[in-house]
């Protein structure tokens, strides 16, 4: 199983749909098989794949929409979360590197929509109690945040440290190209998306601090108050 699985994963990274179809036709069990080792992908898809993940996790991380559909049709589980971090394909699809050369926000949103249509639970929490909304917010994926809020993700859900995704939105998370012009613009769009969704800036985290309390930037505080 391991060699065919590695070949399938290589085809996914290369976005080679013909080869993906070939390997799934030869061995349908590959659609649900777990990977055996932790691997960092850095070439076409930038993401860790952990022991217990499936091919669908990698396809989701790379926004390989057509391959995601192929894997789902072959029986892949949209809610599979057998890695030690308990992350599902939807968590991986919500991650992003907005300053990276392969960044594609439209394909990211379509991949998220495809997984949700296949039954992925929108607010499933990983080992850190993070939802897909937390992860999209943390990595400054503005279009993904807007879409997840639009289709009903709960902005009040807290992660393991007690933070909601809205709290993360007003802080520098160290991800998503923090400090770049792209990241600053994405952060403003994300905050606007939370406000438009009806999320309350007075929302408290696990330490009793509101979203406004967590906002250190005067510009962000203006956005939250409606003056920006």
Where are these regions (language model features)?
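Ankyrin-repeat boundary/"N-cap" motif
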Residues: 2-8, 33-55, 81-99, 125-131, ...
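Amphipathic alpha-helical repeat scaffolds
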Residues: 5-13, 21, 57
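Conserved ankyrin/ankyrin-like repeat signature
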Residues: 19, 66-67, 107-111, 143-144, ...
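Ankyrin repeat domain, specifically the short helix-to-loop turn at the C-terminus of the second helix
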Residues: 24-30, 37-38, 69-77, 113-121, ...
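Ankyrin-repeat and related helical/solenoid repeat scaffolds used for protein-protein interactions
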Residues: 143-146, 150, 156-207
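Leucine-rich solenoid repeat scaffolds
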Residues: 195, 200-228
């Amino acid at each position: 199983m391991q060699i065919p699985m590695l070949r399938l994963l290589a085809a996914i990274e290369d976005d080679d749909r013909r080869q993906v179809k070939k390997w799934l036709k030869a061995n349908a069990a590959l659609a649900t098989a777990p990977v055996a080792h932790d691997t960092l992908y850095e070439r076409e898809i930038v993401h860790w794949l952990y022991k217990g993940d499936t091919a669908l996790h990698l396809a989701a991380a790379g926004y390989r929409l057509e391959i995601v559909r192929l894997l789902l049709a072959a029986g892949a589980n949209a809610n599979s979360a057998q890695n030690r971090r308990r992350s599902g394909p939807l968590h991986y699809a919500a991650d992003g590197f907005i300053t990276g050369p392969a960044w594609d926000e439209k394909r990211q949103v379509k991949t998220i929509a495809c997984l949700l249509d296949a039954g992925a639970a929108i607010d499933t929490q990983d080992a850190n109690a993070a939802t897909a909304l937390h992860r999209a917010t943390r990595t400054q994926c503005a279009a993904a945040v807007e879409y997840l809020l639009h289709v009903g993700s709960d902005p009040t859900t807290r992660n393991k440290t007690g933070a909601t995704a809205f709290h993360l939105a007003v802080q520098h998370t160290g991800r998503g190209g923090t400090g770049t012009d792209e990241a600053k613009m994405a952060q403003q769009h994300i905050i606007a998306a939370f406000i438009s969704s009806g999320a309350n800036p007075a929302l408290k985290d696990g330490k009793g601090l509101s979203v406004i309390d967590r906002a250190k930037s005067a510009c962000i505080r203006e956005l939250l108050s409606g003056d920006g």
